[in-house]
Swiss-Prot record:
Region (Disordered): 262-450, 506-541, 636-667
Naturally occurring in which organism (per UniProt): Bos taurus
Biased composition (Acidic residues): 410-429
UniProt-listed InterPro entries: Man6P_isomerase_rcpt-bd_dom_sf, MRH_dom, OS-9-like, OS9-like_dom
The name this protein goes by in its record: Protein OS-9
GO MF, one annotated term: carbohydrate binding
Recorded GO CC terms: endoplasmic reticulum lumen
Amino acid composition bias (Basic and acidic residues), ranges on this chain: 263-279, 304-328, 396-408, 430-450, 636-647
Signal peptide residue numbers: 1-25
Residues with attached carbohydrate: 177
PANTHER family xrefs: OS-9-RELATED, PROTEIN OS-9
One Pfam family linked to the record: PRKCSH
Binding site for a mannooligosaccharide derivative: 117-118, 130, 182, 188, 212, 218
Length: 667
């Protein structure tokens, strides 16, 4: 698709860059197979643009998307200068050779591998057999896939030139002259490949796979920890993919416009930060306009009412205009000054009479409002005696309040009437529901009822998910600054809702049955089937523990399963349930965990299934699989979403994005 096309073109240019230096110097270009086999690349489409045509470096290539957006992609250093001198830089190995490392396998037991109908037996340095087993006994003919002939010579010059074993990091042996093949009449032959497996134990040799690429020609892959000390066979460190960084390439005028927009947005952000970090509001000053008493003494009542309304409007925006709070406080104190009609005072006396209140929190603002309301109630009778105009203007505003507060009996009567109407409506609804349930019981089968119950439950879960999404949108971004804190809050909310659903399912069902029995006679229903108990939340998580044990030499493995009554199984199930509830996860699908350790002989009853250390480590294993794996998947999804958004953006276009279908992007 689009991303694959872009990546393939980049890799093609990358290979061209590898070949180009050799052709310019007159040499012969060669394809570096070692690089392709051991290096991985990942493309990163970044949102930060660059000015096109400014970089002349050899590691920069120009590509274009399907929307004609040009990119400058910088190839990683490893793509241009791969480790061509790796062989020379390899430290000298002073340990035993590869044949010496594998020689202890001669005295070890033969390795067995069962695949479909056949069982394969490999005896190091001797032969390879194939036969069929039934009831731990060999049935039918034993076929020889080959006898030991030779081993790969690491010191041979021809072997060094092939580099096949060095690249694949395996040692091989050849087995031939086996049983005659019925298909082509030739003797069977096999190649055995030995690979390092650092995770296996001291004697952890095992046959990993058996392939038959050609008729009667076999390839056995054996993994063993014996070869890991050798540097040529030790697996390379798993390196992260080499990133190919691609920046949108803009024309000079587009790039300058982008830089100007960034500068403007930065200045706007700095101003906003400075506004938030302002110190305490400044105190009143005698130079402020509008606070000098002589000019305000002759103000009309209409102006005072407008000032009072402006004060309550400004209280709704306390943080945006902090200096105006003090002005409104001064204006609220002006009625007292006008009532007494004092002569003009000096600035010093004015400052002594001013009360400065600093509002630092919403609680302080509420207290200030209450004080101002109390002050106006106390001051209004005095002002009413000397200024009848004020009382005349304030009476209409008080009348609605008195009407609301003075009729509690009428309000109670209205509430009682509404309650009676609600009860009548509820009774009608109950009757309709009862008739509907009667009809359903006569029509629906028990399976249909279970299905309807499941659909109702699914609908409840969808509603809860919508509530969670709405809660996430309403979360204060300043209160939960870190994404991890927001995720933990959502998980905790999900866990709480799951517990509520569980309690509702446990408590509501018997209560509903009692209500139905009170209203009408219901025929007795048969007891619920065992399947319904398994659908209960208590049985959503089931742990199954099985043990594989050899029945004897050259015999099949016996499978033992832990009984449900085993207390150790109950302990493991409780551990998993607690982890799922705490992290707000649901149990979906199956998870298989294999614990490989030396087995003990004995029956199921006297054998210890899991050691204390195994049980202790299970919690960490579950956490890594369920929780940490989910977080990594979420991060990867977010990264892919950002890459797709960056790819769709077309710089300089009116809409700013391409017109491609979202489904066609698959990085």
């Amino acid at each position: 698709m689009a991303a694959e096309t872009l990546l393939s073109s980049l890799l093609g240019l990358l290979l061209l860059g590898l070949l180009l230096p050799a052709t310019l110097t007159g040499g012969v270009g060669s394809l570096n197979l070692e690089e392709l086999s051991e290096m991985r690349y990942g493309i990163e489409i970044l949102p930060l643009p660059v000015m096109g045509g400014q970089s002349q470096a050899s590691d920069v290539v120009i590509v274009s998307s399907k929307y004609k957006q040009r990119y400058e992609c910088r190839l990683p250093a490893g793509a241009i200068h791969f480790q061509r001198e790796r062989e020379e830089e390899t430290p000298a190995y002073q340990g035993p050779g590869i044949p010496e490392l594998l020689s202890p396998m001669k005295d070890a037991p033969c390795l067995l591998k069962t695949k479909d109908w056949w069982t394969y037996e490999f005896c190091y340095g001797r032969h390879i057999q194939q036969y069929h087993m039934e009831d731990s006994e060999i049935k039918g003919e034993v076929l020889y896939l080959g006898y030991y002939q030779s081993a790969f010579d690491w010191d041979d010059e021809t072997a060094k030139a092939s580099k096949q074993h060095r690249l694949k990091r395996y040692h091989s042996q050849t087995y031939g002259n086996g049983s005659k093949c019925d298909l082509n009449g030739r003797p069977r032959e096999a190649e055995v490949r030995f690979l390092c497996d650092e995770g296996a134990g001291i004697s952890g040799d095992y046959i990993d796979r058996v392939d038959e690429p050609l008729s009667c020609s076999y390839v056995l892959t054996i993994r063993t920890p014996r070869l890991c000390p050798h540097p040529l066979l030790r697996p390379p460190p798993s390196a992260a993919p080499q990133a190919i960084l691609c920046h949108p390439a803009l024309q000079p005028e587009e790039y300058m416009a982008y830089v100007q927009r960034q500068a403007d947005s930065k200045q706007y952000g700095d101003r906003a930060i400075e506004g938030r970090q302002d110190p305490d509001p400044p105190v009143w000053s005698e130079t402020k306009p509008g606070v000098v008493p002589p000019k305000k003494a002759g103000a009309s009542p209409a102006k005072e009412n407008s000032k009072e309304s402006d004060f309550w409007k400004m209280l709704h925006e306390p943080e945006e205009q902090p200096p105006e709070k003090e002005e409104t406080q001064a204006e609220e104190q002006e009625p007292n000054l006008e009532a007494t009609d004092p002569p003009p005072t000096s600035p010093d006396d004015f400052q002594n009479n001013v009360q400065v209140k600093v509002i630092r929190s919403p609680a302080d603002l509420i207290r200030l409002i209450e004080e101002l309301k109390g002050g106006t109630r106390k001051g209004k009778p005095n002002t009413g005696q000397e200024q009848p105009g004020d009382s005349a203007t304030e009476v209409p505003s008080r009348e609605p309040e008195m009407k609301e507060k003075g009729d509690p009996e009428q309000q109670n009567e209205v509430e009682e009437e509404e309650d009676d109407e609600d009860e009548d409506e509820d009774e009608d609804e109950r009757q309709l529901l009862g008739e509907f349930e009667k009809e359903l019981e006569g029509i629906l089968l028990p399976s249909d009822r279970e299905r309807l119950r499941a659909e109702v439950k699914a609908g409840m879960e969808r509603e809860l998910e919508n509530i969670i999404q709405e809660t996430e949108k309403e979360l204060d971004p300043d209160g939960l600054k870190k994404e991890s804190e927001r995720d933990r809050a959502i998980l905790a909310l999900t866990s709480t809702l799951n517990k509520l659903i569980k309690r509702l399912e446990e408590k509501q069902s018997p209560e509903l049955m009692k209500k139905h029995r009170k209203r009408r006679v219901v025929p007795k229903k048969p007891p619920p089937s065992p399947q319904s108990t398994e659908e209960d939340p208590e049985h959503r998580v089931r742990v199954r523990v099985t043990k594989l044990r050899h029945g004897g030499p050259n015999q099949d493995l016996t499978v033992l399963e832990m009984k449900r009554e085993n207390p150790q199984l109950k302990q493991i199930e409780g551990l998993v349930k607690d982890l799922l509830e705490r992290e707000g996860l649901t149990a979906e699908g199956k998870i298989e965990i294999k614990i490989v350790r030396p087995g003990t002989e004995g029956t199921e009853e006297d054998a210890r299934w899991l050691t204390d250390e195994d049980t202790k480590n299970l919690k960490e294993i579950f956490f890594n699989i369920l929780v940490q794996g989910a977080e990594e998947a979420q991060k990867e999804r977010q990264r892919q979403k950002e890459l797709e958004s960056n790819y769709r953006r077309v710089w300089g276009s009116p809409g700013g994005e391409g017109t491609g279908d979202l489904d066609e992007f698959d990085f």
